[in-house]
């Protein structure tokens, strides 16, 4: 069972903290994580790009000049692809880029991403991250205490004070545990997570 330190906001270790083997101690599966990240990014695409073919652009019904005798190249329509304002060859049309990934694969990818943070010693568990008012200095102090640069902060619930305190800090993102995903876990080097958020993750994935 993985054991990490439980810290306060000043960076002082309070005690050891046990993590679930079933969530934070699985064998890291790079392939499944890659598949899930590809799907996440693909599913963000709108797929609304559209261009017109020569059949759809306006104008061009009449032959611009006679076939022979002008000295110019023969043309049949001013909306042929080689003309300015002509149609597009193989014009792109709206489509869905959605990729489906089995639930079991998504769960394994999440466990693998969390386990990789434990393996790399890039996870920090905080006893609490409560703030009465937004204070960027307070978040900066926490980051400095753990020498954290590119950091993902995960809270148990949506916390506007923490979010507002960190949103102007470059390379730092704050999300509630409900919105935690594999892409964000891999994108950021360090994971700072509250004890309550860990409990929620273990409830879902253990």
Curated annotation (Swiss-Prot):
Cited Gene3D superfamilies: 3.40.1370.10
Task: Enumerate the GO terms in the molecular function aspect.
Answer: rRNA binding; structural constituent of ribosome
> Could you say which protein family the record assigns here?
Belongs to the universal ribosomal protein uL4 family.
Q: Which GO terms describe its biological process?
A: translation
Q: How does it assemble?
A: Part of the 50S ribosomal subunit.
What is the source species?
Clostridium kluyveri (strain ATCC 8527 / DSM 555 / NBRC 12016 / NCIMB 10680 / K1)
Q: Where do the record's region annotations for Disordered lie?
A: 51-76
Family matches, as HAMAP family: Ribosomal_uL4_B
In Pfam terms, one family for this protein is: Ribosomal_L4
State the source organism's domain of life: Bacteria
Q: Which GO terms describe its cellular component?
A: ribonucleoprotein complex; ribosome
Q: What is this protein called?
A: Large ribosomal subunit protein uL4
């Amino acid at each position: 069972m993985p054991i990490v330190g439980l810290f306060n906001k000043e960076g002082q270790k309070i005690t050891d903290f046990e993590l679930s083997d079933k969530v934070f101690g699985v064998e890291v599966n790079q392939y499944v994580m890659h598949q899930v990240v590809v799907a996440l990014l693909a599913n963000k695409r709108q797929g609304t790009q559209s261009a017109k073919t020569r059949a759809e652009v306006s104008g061009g019904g009449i032959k611009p000049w006679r076939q022979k005798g002008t000295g110019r190249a023969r043309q049949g329509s001013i909306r042929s692809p080689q003309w300015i304002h002509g149609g597009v060859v193989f014009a792109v049309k709206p489509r869905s880029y959605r990729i489906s990934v089995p639930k079991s694969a998504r769960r394994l990818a999440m466990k693998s991403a969390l386990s990789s943070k434990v393996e790399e010693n890039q996870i920090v568990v905080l006893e609490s991250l409560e703030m009465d008012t937004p204070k960027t200095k307070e978040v900066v102090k926490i980051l400095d205490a753990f020498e954290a640069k590119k950091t993902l902060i995960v809270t148990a619930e949506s916390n506007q004070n923490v979010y507002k305190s960190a949103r102007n800090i470059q390379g730092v993102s704050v999300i509630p545990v409900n919105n935690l995903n594999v892409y964000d876990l891999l994108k950021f080097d360090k994971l700072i997570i509250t004890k309550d958020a860990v409990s929620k993750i273990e409830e879902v994935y253990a």
